[in-house]
């Protein structure tokens, strides 16, 4: 070792601070399993990220998965894997997900080279490998240069963000990327990638924070973006469109990475006669009355819904006890009392919350479905609401005109 004292041990990558542990030793293995149990019991954590999972013993990860399933059925295991066949780690026996470094590379090089074929090929290839498993999608992290520094044209930050949230996978944001901050490795050090941030330093007119906020809302509200089948619809070096389809519904992403405007005629993935730009709809929900059935319902999405779902998720504790009474849940719904049928319907759904655990789960599920239906009605009532983009459905095609280096997320509906 560096002290030349005759003491040594195996390490990772030549770094003595990263000791290589003998996971075949029962005491070492049990120590790690009990550590997980401590964090679940003490802090009710929901998952673990395994650093350098590509060098961990497969047998240990299988045992870890089984152990965690016994602690918490929905416990999530995600591993850092750089290269290789991701399905070797992300499968029903080991990890739920791994880092999608292959797509990470395509996100910046596909834009720098004006080559959407690379990104489209990567998505299709990975779908064929991992199937229904959702990979951990990112454009940068604490180990790689910031996406802002990697992109030749900083305007491409917009379309990169859209891709992270709309392709198959689990989107993630590395702090600061929502503002588009730069960062490169310096002399082999990662510290320049991990700065302290002062929010007062960032320009409020930056469009990226609002875009990320909108994309996060859409990911929550439209299950097509999480569970929908992926269908490639349109592909050139400079333009790319795909759909996420679920139960006869579709959300279409259309992108233009060229420095000039683009006209796209995209085959419809479903029967539809109306196209709505979700990026604009979501940003204007609280200020344009015609984009929602009424203002109180719109505000309820931003205020009462999060409180309600937080309480609903805690209704049943680890030992099965009821933590909140129905009255507590009803308080979270006060903002939904609009006098409309929707408000009454939600009220009725929560009438029997105290009956049984099964009934509670059913009610919560029905509430989510009702909220999704209400949101869809609001979207359909909102009109095209385009913001510089042009959308039209004609002769079985979605006609999209996009400005330079911009994209849209479109909800297709059949009125």
Predicted feature descriptions by range:
Residues 1-42, 64-70, 87:
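Substrate-binding/active-site clefts of carbohydrate-active enzymes
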Residues 288-377:
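Long intrinsically disordered, low-complexity regions that are acidic and Ser/Thr-rich
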Residues 168-182:
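Substrate-binding cleft of secreted/luminal carbohydrate-active enzymes
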Residues 296, 379, 389-415:
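C-terminal beta-strand-rich structural cap/linker in extracellular carbohydrate-active enzymes
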Residues 35, 41-44, 51-135, 153-154, ...:
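Active-site-proximal helices and loops of the catalytic beta/alpha 8
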Residues 147-152:
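Short, solvent-exposed helix-loop connector elements
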Residues 233-269, 311, 369, 405-408:
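Carbohydrate-binding surface patches
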């Amino acid at each position: 070792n560096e002290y030349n004292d005759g003491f040594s041990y195996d390490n990772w990558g030549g770094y003595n601070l990263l000791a290589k542990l003998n996971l075949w030793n029962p005491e070492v293995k049990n120590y790690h399993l009990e550590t997980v149990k401590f964090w679940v019991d003490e802090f009710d954590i929901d998952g673990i990220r395994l650093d350098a999972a590509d060098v961990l013993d497969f047998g240990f990860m299988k045992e870890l998965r089984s152990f965690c399933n016994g602690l918490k059925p929905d416990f999530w295991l995600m591993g850092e894997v750089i290269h290789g066949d991701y399905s070797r780690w992300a499968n029903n026996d080991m990890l739920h997900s791994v880092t999608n470094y292959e797509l990470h590379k395509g996100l910046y090089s596909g834009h720098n080279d004006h080559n959407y074929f690379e990104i489209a090929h990567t998505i299709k290839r990975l779908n064929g490998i991992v199937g229904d498993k959702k990979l951990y999608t990112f454009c940068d992290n604490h180990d790689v240069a910031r996406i802002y520094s990697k992109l030749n044209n900083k305007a491409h930050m917009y379309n990169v963000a859209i891709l992270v949230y709309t392709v198959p996978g689990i989107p993630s944001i590395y702090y600061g990327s929502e503002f588009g901050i730069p960062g490169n490795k310096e002399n082999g050090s990662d510290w320049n990638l991990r700065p302290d941030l002062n929010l007062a330093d960032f320009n409020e007119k930056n469009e990226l924070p609002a875009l990320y906020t909108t994309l996060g809302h859409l990911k929550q509200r439209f299950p097509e973006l999480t569970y929908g089948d992926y269908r490639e619809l349109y592909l050139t070096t400079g333009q790319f469109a795909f759909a996420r389809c679920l139960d006869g519904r579709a959300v279409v992403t259309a992108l233009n990475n060229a420095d000039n405007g683009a006209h796209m005629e995209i085959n419809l993935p479903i029967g539809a006669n109306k196209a709505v730009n979700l990026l604009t709809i979501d940003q204007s929900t609280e200020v344009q009355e015609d984009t929602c059935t009424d203002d109180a319902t719109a505000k309820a999405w931003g205020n009462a819904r999060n409180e309600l779902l937080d309480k609903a998720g805690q209704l049943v504790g680890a030992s099965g006890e009821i933590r909140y009474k129905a009255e507590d849940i009803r308080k979270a719904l006060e903002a939904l009392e609009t006098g409309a049928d929707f408000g009454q319907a939600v009220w009725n759904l929560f009438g029997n919350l105290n009956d049984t655990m099964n009934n509670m789960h059913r009610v919560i599920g029905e509430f989510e479905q009702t909220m999704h239906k209400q949101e869809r009605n609001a979207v359909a009532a909102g009109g095209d609401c385009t913001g510089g983009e042009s959308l039209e459905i004609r002769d079985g095609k979605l006609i999209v005109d996009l400005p330079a280096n911009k994209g849209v997320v479109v909800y297709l509906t059949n009125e």
